[in-house]
Swiss-Prot record:
Family indicated by similarity: Belongs to the universal ribosomal protein uS19 family.
Molecular functions (GO terms): rRNA binding; structural constituent of ribosome
Keyword Translocase: no
Function: Protein S19 forms a complex with S13 that binds strongly to the 16S ribosomal RNA.
Listed name of the protein: Small ribosomal subunit protein uS19
Species, as recorded: Wigglesworthia glossinidia brevipalpis
One biological process term in Gene Ontology: ribosomal small subunit assembly
Keyword Ribonucleoprotein included in the entry's annotation: yes
HAMAP family associated with the record: Ribosomal_uS19
PANTHER family: RIBOSOMAL PROTEIN S19P FAMILY MEMBER, SMALL RIBOSOMAL SUBUNIT PROTEIN US19M
One cellular component term from this protein's GO annotations in UniProt: cytoplasm
Alphabetical keyword list: Ribonucleoprotein, Ribosomal protein, RNA-binding, rRNA-binding
């Protein structure tokens, strides 16, 4: 179920504070975050944010088509290694 419109989009305060600091200084700095639940705002466009997938931080470059989505949508948490191969040998 989507979030109520009267509540507005969610972003963690510590992440918002880091984004505002980088916007003021104008530096290109990588932001590391564990907040996969935060919504991508238009202020984040052009930044690189490193999002934790449970094992390591994966950097993602924020584009304009990502606005409104969550950070966790772009970093998969599970790796698919494929199904086990069929090991039967055919006899001729």
């Amino acid at each position: 179920m989507p979030r109520s419109l009267k509540k507005g989009p969610f972003i963690d305060f510590h992440l918002l504070k880091k984004i505002e600091e980088i916007k003021q200084t104008g530096k290109k700095k990588l932001i590391r975050t564990w907040s996969r639940r935060s919504t991508i705002f238009p202020d984040m466009i052009g930044m690189t944010i490193s999002v934790h997938n449970g094992k390591q931080h994966i950097p993602i470059f924020i584009g304009d088509e990502m606005v409104g989505h969550k950070l966790g949508e772009f970093v998969p948490t599970r790796t698919y290694r494929g199904h086990s191969a069929d090991k039967k040998i055919k006899k001729r």
